[in-house]
Amino acid sequence: MATKKHGEACHSEQSEETWFAVRQSHIHAHASQIKSKDRVSQRGEVFTAEREVNAMLDLVANECLRPDSRFLEPACGDGNFLAAILRRKLSELRRKYKKSPRDYEKLSIVAIGSLYGVDIMNDNVEECRKRLFNIWNEEYTAHCKADSFDETREAAQFIISRNIINGNALTLMCVDAEGNDTTAPIVFSEWTLIGSTQMQRSDYTMADLLLHNDTSKKDGMGNLFALTEEQKEEGGIFLRRYITHYKRVQDYEGHRDEL
C-alpha cells in the first residue's frame, strides 16, 4: 500500500455485500518501503510493511476469508494489502473446496472480483495488477491442475484490469501517465455471481457511489454497493450492466473512455 501522511483503518458492517476501505497510519519508512525519496516528498508514497499489513487484516480476519467480502484500497501502491487479502481468501477456498476444482475456480473469480484499488502512479497500478494475477494464477493452476483453463485466466485478468485503476482517489478521476487528472471518472464494476455460472457486471462511477453511500453512521462504516436497484437507477448512477458466464466476462470490454 502507498499511503499519504496519515490514514485510518475502517471496515463496513458485515453483510453479503460488505465493502471495506483499508488504510493505515503513517509509519517510519524503511528502505524496502519506498521507491525513491522524490516519490516520498512529491507524492507521500510509503509502502506498508508485511507485519503491519497482517496485523491490520487480523482485525477483520473473518471477512478476509469470505470470497465476496469487498475491499477497497484508495492508495493501493503495488498491492501489499490487496495481495495479502487475496492470499487469505484463496487459502480458505482451497481448504473448503479441496475436492471440487470447479467450485474453487468459480469462487476464486468471485474473490478476485472483490478487490479494488486506486493509485495515482501508473507503475504501481501495473505492478499491482500483475501481482494479483500471479498470486491468483499460481493458486488456480496448482489447485485445478488439468481442470484449469486459459479462458478463466483471461477472465481473471480482465476483472483485475477493471478493478485496479490508475486514478486520483481524492478527485475521483482517472489520471494520465504524469498523474494529472483526465476527464474520465473512476468507474468501478460490481461483480455478482448469479446462479451457478452466470456473473453480472454493473458499472458505477466512484463519485456517485460515494455520494449515495450512507456514511452517516458514527463508526464511519458504509457499503458502496448497498443501494437497492431502485435507488441506483432512480439516482442516475447506474451506467451499464452485463450478464454472462463467469469465464466470459472479458467479452464485454466497456472501455472507460467511452463513458
Predicted regions and their residues:
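SAM-dependent methyltransferase catalytic region
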Residues: 2-6, 13, 19-26, 30-259
